[in-house]
Amino acid sequence: MIQSRIFAAVVALTISLPALAAEEPAWTQTLERISSGVVSIRVDSTRAFDTEWNTSSQATGFVVDAKRGLILTNRHVVTPGPVIAEAVFRNNEEVELTPVYRDPVHDFGFFRYDPAELRYIEPVELPLAPGGAGIGKEIRVIGNDAGEQLSILAGTIARLDRKAPEYGRGKYNDFNTFYLQAASGTSGGSSGSPVVNIDGEVVALNAGANSSAASSFFLPLDRVERALRKLQNDEPVTRGTLQTTFRSEPYDELRRLGLTEASETLARKRFPSQTGMLTVEQVIPGSPAAGVLSPGDILINVNGELVTEFVALAAILDNNVVHEIAVSVERGGSRIDARIQVEVLHAITPDEY
């Protein structure tokens, strides 16, 4: 038995090695083609209202609209407060950056530079591909890892449904979203790096890492792509909230919380690849959802649609700001229907005093 397993492993390795060797030139061509659009960012920021301390640091960003001079990076790089920043391109040209958007919750934001200031380089735009991430997909993280200006780290996507990483009390922590995870070993300076596939498409945004392991955490691009479209069309990036945090729970835990067999059957049939549904984790006292939703409630329908994951929920909230939505949950096996006002998520973070 052991010999047969060893033989099978050798055969698999023998088959895979030519494929890997064939991919190397393709990766080389891709990385050379897109590297002009990746920049290192130097940041000096004051302490903001929302979790961030004053800092002088380095990070990464990449061009997503060369005509408008839009650079995508992390929220904790743009920061929620006043910031002085500059981008350094591959040929060491420097440009000043102006923050144009920082998401109130998720770890992404946009800077703008003046394209006319660039004299010797025409940076390539890196296309966003939110649907391009998949388990087992080979990726490269390109950025200013460890302050080296341009580093390339390889990895394989292992998870698409990781809970948002927790960096500790009093620090910025994302919520109401899944994260992607891969063992790519990113470190300081790689925040905001593009996570690209072999075609040069950005499938995720590097956001953080586990300092005691090789795990890296990537933000999905669904809401990022929407925000970019809004900015390109000179439209406000509307963001809605129920002032409630949700978490995804597996079906076995949902049954203990009172999920009915009918609801589980419907969810499994409609979304066969998903392994759970959303539950209420916390509700802010005094919010529109207070007294309506309770921790442990299982989210079933929103505006008549079966909602089992974060992207669908965020889309409904963002498109119904200052309007009421119909929400159906199950609590202890009983169904509860209610209407809740969607509030402006941007209004929760103060920006002046």
Model regions: which residues?
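Conserved active-site neighborhood of the chymotrypsin/trypsin-like protease fold
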Residues: 46-47, 65-151, 179, 211-213, ...
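C-terminal recognition in membrane/secretory proteostasis and scaffolding
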Residues: 29, 67, 75, 98-99, ...
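Beta-strand/loop subdomains of soluble extracytoplasmic proteins
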Residues: 83-98, 134-140, 150-166, 222-227, ...
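Bacterial N-terminal signal peptides
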Residues: 8-18
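Gly/Ser-enriched beta-turn/beta-hairpin loop segments
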Residues: 48-54, 102-106, 162-180, 235-237, ...
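Active-site region of chymotrypsin-like
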Residues: 37, 54, 114-126, 152-214, ...
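Active-site-proximal beta-strands of protease catalytic cores
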Residues: 37-42, 70-74, 97, 132-145, ...
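A conserved glycine-rich beta-strand in the N-terminal activation segment of trypsin-fold
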Residues: 22-29, 47-68, 94-96, 122-123, ...
